[in-house]
Swiss-Prot record:
Disulfide bonds: 78-84, 80-225
CDD domains reported in the protein's UniProt record: GDPD_like_SMaseD_PLD
Organism per entry: Loxosceles intermedia (Brown spider)
Entry's Gene Ontology BP terms: killing of cells of another organism; lipid catabolic process
Gene Ontology MF: a single term: metal ion binding
Tissue: Expressed by the venom gland.
InterPro entries reported in the protein's UniProt record: PLC-like_Pdiesterase_TIM-brl
Lineage of producing organism: Eukaryota, Metazoa, Ecdysozoa, Arthropoda, Chelicerata
Name by which UniProt lists this protein: Dermonecrotic toxin LiSicTox-alphaV1
Pfam families reported in the protein's UniProt record: GDPD_2
Principal location: secreted
Known EC number: 4.6.1.-
Length: 307
């Protein structure tokens, strides 16, 4: 009987502590920041970037001419001071990613809550982009979402380089509906990363059947080898905060220097894509930031605009 009460007390304490943590996070009025590890294409890099402090990662996906997702691979050129040729077969990477984001798995990393797939559709046509979207949906469903049963829990962003390839989104959504898993679209967001005019980007989303503020992240940026102003980031932030805007969240890439991270956060970015997640962690601990910003957790909805 004594053992029972001890066990009950200990388990109850753990449950209460978990509930307290959730309450604290919901009560925290600081802006959540997504610390996005850039170019995570080899399986071992998942742990590497999470260990550095990332709560999100970006992974490149290449396609064959037949519109089949093939490798997680960036290739040359890429960011300065990075090795451009790390890779995995897409299916293998998705399986490893599932383990890293499935509670209870030995490889589970609770901090990893968001994955941006940089879809290298450059060599596809507008019509084959649709086929590529269907193919990638099939692969995610099978290898990441485990057929819809106890799969990975991370939120997913489909990041497309060309507005003309909006049909990738159409194909992706229709494939999940065809296979009876339209519910998984609740975990999927969208982005065009080619730095196009915001009004043209909005029109492309509408063609893809994505309504204003329907899981839309708007990116802006350039390789870390070059400098880029925050002008378009501020335009995107203004759109996000407008009552008639189309954007939910804004992220800036690729940002490695402390001063640039500070500037991006002060400009209103929700996410910072970086080769050095520890830099973002350090900045968020600084006196000027720790009272107003924090690392995003799984309790932060990435499709809701922070107010």
């Amino acid at each position: 009987m004594l053992c029972f009460f001890v066990l009950f007390f200990c388990c109850g304490t753990v449950l209460l502590e978990g509930a307290d943590i959730d309450e604290i996070e919901h009560a925290d009025k600081r802006r959540p920041i997504w610390n996005m590890g850039h170019m995570v294409n080899a399986v071992y890099q998942i742990d590497e970037f999470v260990d550095l402090g990332a709560n999100a990662i970006e992974t490149d996906v290449t396609f064959t001419k037949s519109a089949n997702a093939e490798y997680t691979y960036h290739g040359v050129p890429c960011d300065c001071h990075r090795w451009c040729k790390k890779w995995e077969y897409v299916n293998d990477f998705l399986k490893a990613l599932r383990r890293a984001t499935t509670p209870g798995d030995a490889k589970y990393r609770s901090q990893l809550i968001l994955v941006v797939f940089d879809l290298k559709t450059d060599y596809l046509t507008a019509s084959t982009a649709y086929d590529a979207g269907k193919d990638f949906a099939k692969r995610l469903l099978q290898h990441y979402w485990n057929g819809g049963s106890n799969g990975g829990r991370a939120y997913i962003i489909l990041s497309i380089p060309d507005l003309a390839h909006y049909k990738f989104i159409n194909g992706f959504k229709e494939q999940l509906k065809t296979q009876g898993h339209e519910d998984l679209l609740a975990k999927v967001g969208y982005d065009f990363w080619g730095n196009e005019d915001l009004s043209s980007t909005r029109a492309a989303f509408q063609k893809a059947g994505v309504q204003d503020k329907e899981h839309i992240w708007q990116s802006d940026g350039i390789t870390n080898c070059w400098l880029r102003t925050l002008k378009r980031v501020r335009e995107a932030v203004a759109n996000r905060d407008s009552s008639n805007g189309y954007i939910n969240k804004v992220y800036y890439w690729t940002v490695d220097k402390y001063a640039s991270v500070r500037d991006a956060i002060n400009a209103g970015a929700d996410g910072i894509m970086t080769n050095y997640p520890n830099v973002i962690v350090d900045v968020l601990k600084e006196n000027d930031f720790k009272g107003k910003f924090r690392m995003a957790t799984y309790n932060d909805n990435p499709w809701e605009t922070f107010k």
